Amino acid sequence: MFCRTPTAFLNFHSSKAHRVLYAFFRSGTMALSTPVPPASLLEEMVVPSRQLFGPGPSNMADTIADAQHRNLLGHLHPEFIKIMADTRLGLQYVFKTKNSYTFAVSGTGHSGMECALVNLLERGDRFLVVEIGLWGKRAADLAIRMGIDVNIVAAPHGEAIEEYKPQVVFVCHGESSTGVVQPLDGIGEICHQTGALLLVDTVASLGGARFDADALGVDCVYSATQKVLNAPPGLAPISFSDRAIEKIRNRKTRVASFYFDALELGNYWGCDAEIKRYHHTAPISTVYALRTALAIVAKEGIDASIDRHYQNAQLIYKLLEANSLEPFVEKEEWRLPCLTTVKVPAGVDWKEVADDLMAEGVEIAGGLGPTVGKIWRIGTFGLNSDKTKIEQVISLLARAVKKRCNL
């Protein structure tokens, strides 16, 4: 019961109900009990050391892990604002863009997808999704929840764009559920000829496959920190072109999410010329980690990083062939260089093999969505795109498969 006026309070205070409640509390009937702490919470946390060769997260470099241990700063302290500015420059570098609205969303790669969709789409818009795996399905599902008119196609044909006349076209560049890399040449040009914006998912490909946002005419691109960048999950790099920002500024309705509003986030990250406004408290330690991860890529060179992933992918294919194992993606030009999918041989339980490797301290993963039970997924992201490590993981995989085939 809430007393909204002084009169109501006085009436309640002198009422029979008040006297009954007072006696009830005095009797101890509603005395709060002291909860017993969970026994497991009082034990020391155990975190084993593993080689993470699944689809993400990947292993962190020591310098990235160390960066997270730095002193916390306030989210509006000038020193932290400088770190955010460095991070923005690093993201422009790896995306290969001059877009002012380039920053990181506080959340996983999935938050990047949601941020892109809630800003670029509103009711009445048409959304064309190129579906080459699970993440196209996910983008379509999110848009349908928003009340958007969604059309799904299997390939980015110009005819489909001209027929549906969408406001936004979605393409997943690196599809982690299948290990496919989607060529993007010419798609941006077709989109712009019809007035559409091109939205690209690079969660599994940024830094490990060839991508140039500006040269490809990409209007919005998002990614994640826990794949090739080798940072912890928790931030979603994202970039909006001037075309995309113009569409957002001219929406008929406000962006439904304050948290994901690109204009608000852009101001917080220093993307505009306005006085910085408080938006939310960024995951400060994770920003430290991302800034450090981007510095590692910059020191190697973004093109050198990408070339290394392509070269080591060739090594994987040779090792698979030598051990009578088959890549799931048949055409080499469609294979994602930083995540290889391998066919599970007939009669072999994929999970038993994965469990054998896990017992050796090495993680690989099974399929996702339509590929469940059909493939293994081997991520060679960032520092794990290494000749010695790759030889080790393929050797363990081949040995585990041979063991299962001979049972």
What are these regions (language model features)?
Residues 31-78:
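N-terminal "arm"/small-domain region of PLP-dependent enzymes with the aminotransferase-like
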Residues 59-60, 226-317:
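Active-site C-terminal subdomain of aminotransferase-like
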Residues 67-115, 134, 138-144:
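Conserved N-terminal alpha-helix of the aminotransferase class I/II PLP-enzyme fold
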Residues 121-137:
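Conserved PLP-anchoring active-site segment centered on the Schiff-base-forming lysine
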Residues 158-205, 220, 228:
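Active-site phosphate-binding strand-loop segment of PLP-dependent enzymes
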Residues 214-226, 236:
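Conserved active-site segment immediately N-terminal to the catalytic lysine
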Residues 326-357:
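Conserved PLP-binding catalytic core of the aspartate aminotransferase-like
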Residues 370, 374-407:
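PLP-dependent enzyme catalytic core of the Aspartate aminotransferase-like
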